[in-house]
């Protein structure tokens, strides 16, 4: 599919135009939502605030990952300098992410999507899978097995800091600085325990949310090996609640992102509407939410299968 068959040159120029104001607002809202969750738990420390707070923080941690994705593509802000600065410090560092390492692999995924050379293919090639198999995967996530592997890897990176590459070392140092700043802030406010909540969300919730987000984008699509993104990638028409948890910052419009990766996230919704109005999506059945998605990527009981 060629988007130029459906969009004018002026529309494409508008869709790919960056806005520093909108980008700054998205980053600010991301941090304000995190702050609001911590404030609610700190002011009213009760299971009725802490348990939902941990779940929502897992979604916000994915939100930081989406900002890393956008800054890595150089599409959030107009200047490369701002994309790098915000991506490194305000998006990647809170979860010890390495934006440059991430985007190198991600760009290969964009070039090779729809082929057997897609580096992300093993993550969703087997779908649809049985509900029992998906439940086992999510059980590993929610019991911390997946997150603890990540945490152990981070521990090894910190212990071996001098031996890391300059790029990797800088990413780890930024993560240490930002996380120590969070711990220091909570300690100064007399609520150091809130940092533990951040870690718990990272270990026990964020892996499951990230898995569902990844499944939503490419699993059980019409044809993983078709070069047309309409066949190998999916968009979900989800409401605010579903998007906030599993597809923050409009990343649920993933088909549009694969059709034209130069479009910032704050224009993807408009791009989807334009293409839908002009028949580009005729015959495509978009899931209404992530529960609908999970029904589509799973099937009934099956025999023994790999985890």
Predicted regions span which residues?
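Transmembrane alpha-helical segments that form the membrane-embedded catalytic/substrate-channel core
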Residues: 58-68, 100, 138, 145-150, ...
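Aspartate-rich (DDxxD/NDxxD/DxxxD) Mg2+/diphosphate-binding motifs
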Residues: 67-86, 117-124
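Histidine-centered catalytic micro-motifs
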Residues: 64-73, 102-114, 213-220, 247-263
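Cytosolic juxtamembrane regulatory segments of multi-pass membrane proteins
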Residues: 231-250
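Membrane-cytosol interface motif
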Residues: 84, 88-89, 224-236
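Active-site-flanking alpha-helical
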Residues: 37, 72, 76-77, 225, ...
């Amino acid at each position: 599919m060629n988007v130029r068959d459906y969009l004018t040159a002026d529309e494409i120029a508008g869709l790919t135009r960056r806005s520093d104001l909108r980008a700054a607002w998205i980053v600010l809202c991301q941090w304000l939502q995190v702050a609001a969750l911590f404030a609610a738990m700190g002011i009213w420390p009760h299971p009725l605030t802490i348990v939902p707070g941990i779940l929502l923080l897992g979604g916000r941690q994915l939100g930081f990952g989406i900002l890393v994705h956008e800054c890595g593509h150089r599409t959030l802000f107009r200047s490369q300098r701002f994309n790098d600065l915000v991506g490194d410090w305000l998006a990647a560092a809170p979860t010890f992410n390495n934006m440059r390492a991430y985007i190198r692999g991600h760009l290969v995924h964009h070039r090779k999507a729809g082929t057997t050379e897609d580096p992300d293919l093993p993550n969703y090639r087997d779908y649809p899978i049985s509900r029992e198999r998906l439940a086992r995967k999510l059980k590993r996530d929610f019991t911390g097995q997946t997150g603890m592997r990540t945490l152990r890897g981070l521990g090894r990176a910190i212990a071996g800091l001098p031996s890391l590459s300059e790029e990797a070392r800088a990413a780890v140092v930024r993560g240490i600085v930002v996380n120590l700043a969070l711990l220091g802030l909570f300690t100064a406010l007399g609520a150091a325990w809130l940092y533990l909540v951040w870690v718990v969300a990272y270990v026990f919730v964020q892996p499951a949310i990230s898995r569902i987000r990844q499944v939503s984008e490419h699993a059980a699509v019409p044809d993983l090996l078709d070069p047309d993104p309409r066949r190998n990638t999916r968009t979900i028409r989800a409401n605010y609640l579903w998007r906030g948890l599993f597809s923050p910052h409009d990343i649920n419009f993933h088909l549009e992102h694969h059709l034209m990766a130069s479009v910032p996230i704050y224009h993807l919704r408009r791009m989807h509407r334009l293409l839908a109005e002009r028949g580009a999506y005729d015959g495509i059945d978009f899931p209404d939410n992530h529960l609908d998605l999970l029904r589509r990527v799973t099937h009934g009981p099956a025999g023994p299968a790999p985890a």
